[in-house]
């Protein structure tokens, strides 16, 4: 299943509606007549790509492996440049809420939502995982998602080679794409 993200991001998406973020679900089939509810954990996967593209090897391939391991999975293909921070953090927060809202339908344990990311996607996962309680995410959750900040907090993080180093060792290209015209203001 694919879905376009839009709630709370309408003004952002008016600029380039064809570049909206998408969510793709990978949900194991349920057979309620033959099995008890399993309440699987779910992994939200954020592929890397320097905020310029989404690496194909870090999306569906990871989701299929998670299914094999007993998890349900969602791939969040978040907005890329020219969209800049904090758009992607809002999209990740929306995705956590969306998964929790569908937990019963998908036989997912709503208290076992893991946010995973690779490279730039790891940066995004780390951002929501550490910033969910701050004013920016809390006000977005309340105003646009109609929920408390705790509802968009991931229950765990899985970070694969995240782009989280700043200063002279930072992966500059990722941060240029993420911050756009605000690059000089925020980079160090």
Where are these regions (language model features)?
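Short beta-strand element of the alpha/beta-hydrolase
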Residues: 39-48
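Single conserved hydrophobic/aromatic residue that forms the stacking wall/gate
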Residues: 2-13
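A short loop-to-beta-strand scaffold at the N-terminal edge of the catalytic core in hydrolase folds
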Residues: 17-34, 41-42
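Primarily recognizes the serine-hydrolase "nucleophile elbow" in alpha/beta-hydrolase
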Residues: 94-175
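Serine-hydrolase catalytic core
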Residues: 184-188
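A fold-wide structural signal in alpha/beta-hydrolase
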Residues: 41-42, 67-77, 114
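Short beta-to-alpha linker loops that shape the active-site pocket of alpha/beta-hydrolase fold enzymes
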Residues: 29, 49, 72, 77-81, ...
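Catalytic nucleophile-loop/oxyanion-hole region of alpha/beta-hydrolase
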Residues: 54-56, 61, 76-110
